[in-house]
Amino acid sequence: MLRLSERNMKILFVAALVVGSVFFLLLPGPSAADEKKKGPKVTVKVYFDLRIGDEDIGRVVIGLFGKTVPKTVDNFVALATGEKGFGYKDSKFHRVIKDFMIQGGDFTRGDGTGGKSIYGERFPDENFKLKHYGPGWVSMANAGKDTNGSQFFITTVKTAWLDGKHVVFGKVLEGMDVVRKVESTKTDGRDKPLKDVTIADCGKIEVEKPFAIAKE
């Protein structure tokens, strides 16, 4: 009887292993829908050290999506480093609208009518794969279709009405509180800050391993 009992226990043990393996194999893996929910990958970062008037208010670090919009990202990085002999350093955020966005990047005229890209004065819309999902997304400002230069804006709320019209290429990873300080600065009737909001310094931060962020 003892031998039969041991044999039965072994059979039951093996059966349990088989059933467990089958159950594990039948568990659903990540669906195509789940994969689509994954956000874009950050391949490089750019930092802005901002100043309002004579006060340094902190650093904003922006993650850029070089695999999704490589041409747009290359332009932004080069303007942040100044490697082409011109760029964002000492330029201003010339337009600030609370509960909407802050806009900068016009380093030639400083009033929203200038700026240029590393490809020439303007370059085409790369794609509209990404949307303005919420606060902190960075997108190209333009004057209509295919008129990208150097001007950009950072959202402070979800701005779905801009989807398909402006190329999204980055998101604020650090320093959203600094963006909020700029958003809250006093402006005139044309949305220009009463005190200059300046990019006192800027540059590139390498990313060793690209990582995805949430679309939120």
Curated annotation (Swiss-Prot):
GO CC terms: cytoplasm; endoplasmic reticulum chaperone complex; endoplasmic reticulum lumen; intracellular membrane-bounded organelle; melanosome; nucleoplasm; perinuclear region of cytoplasm; protein-containing complex
Domain (PPIase cyclophilin-type) ranges: 47-204
Modified residues (N6-succinyllysine): 84, 209
Intracellular or extracellular location(s): Endoplasmic reticulum lumen; Melanosome
InterPro entries: Cyclophilin-like_dom_sf, Cyclophilin-type_PPIase_CS, Cyclophilin-type_PPIase_dom
CDD domains per record: cyclophilin_ABH_like
GO biological process, one term: positive regulation by host of viral genome replication
Subunit text: Interacts with DYM. Interacts with CALR, CLGN and CANX. Part of a large chaperone multiprotein complex comprising DNAJB11, HSP90B1, HSPA5, HYOU, PDIA2, PDIA4, PDIA6, PPIB, SDF2L1, UGGT1 and very small amounts of ERP29, but not, or at very low levels, CALR nor CANX.
Protein name (Swiss-Prot/TrEMBL): Peptidyl-prolyl cis-trans isomerase B
Organism encoding this protein: Bos taurus (Bovine)
Gene it is expressed from: PPIB
